[in-house]
Amino acid sequence: MKKIVGALAVFVITYALFSAAGYLFPVDQEWYNSLKKPDWTPSGTAIGIIWAILFALISLSAAIVYAAFSFKGAKSFWFTLLINYVLNQAFSYFQFTQKNLLAASLDCLLVAITAIVLLIIAKKYSRAASYLLLPYFLWSAFATFLSFTINSMNL
C-alpha cells in the first residue's frame, strides 16, 4: 500500500510540476497570434490537449519507475527527468516571456534529446515506463521542427 501511495504522489507531483510553465510563463496570445506560422501548425487547443496527455504519460512513467525502484534505485532516471523538466519549463520562458524564438527552438531541441535519453534510460527500469515516453519524444521532435520553422519564418 505504501508503494501505491508513493507512486500516486509521484504521479500528482510530476504532473503538477510539468504543468507549472503554463502558470509561470503564460502565453501572450496577441504576440503568438501575430507570428507567421506554417499551415500545419496545430491549434492552441490541440497543443494544450496534447501536452495534458503527454504530462499524464510522463507522470505515469515516473510513477511506475518509483513503484519499482523508488528514488535511490533509479538515480539515472530521476536525474535525466529533472534535466528534461528544467529544459521543458525553459521553453515556455524563452518562447513566451523572452519572446526569443531561436533560444526556444534550441531549448526545444534539447528537450527532444533529453526525452529520447530518458526513454532509453527508463527501459533499464521498466519497458512500460519507457514506452509511455515514446509519444513525448515524438511530439518533442515535431515541436522542435515546428519551432525552428516558426523562427525562420519570423526572422
UniProtKB/Swiss-Prot annotation:
Recorded protein name is Uncharacterized membrane protein YtaB
Subcellular compartments: Cell membrane
Cellular component aspect of the GO annotation: membrane; plasma membrane
InterPro entries from the UniProt entry: TspO/MBR-related_sf (IPR038330), TspO_MBR (IPR004307)
Family, per entry? Belongs to the TspO/BZRP family.
Q: How does it sit in the membrane?
A: Multi-pass membrane protein
Query: Keywords of this protein's UniProt record, alphabetized?
Result: Cell membrane, Membrane, Transmembrane, Transmembrane helix
Q: Which organism encodes this protein?
A: Bacillus subtilis (strain 168)
Matching entries from CDD domains are given as:
TSPO_MBR (cd15904)
Record-annotated membrane-spanning stretches: 4-24, 46-66, 77-97, 101-121, 130-150
| GO BP term (any one) | tetrapyrrole metabolic process
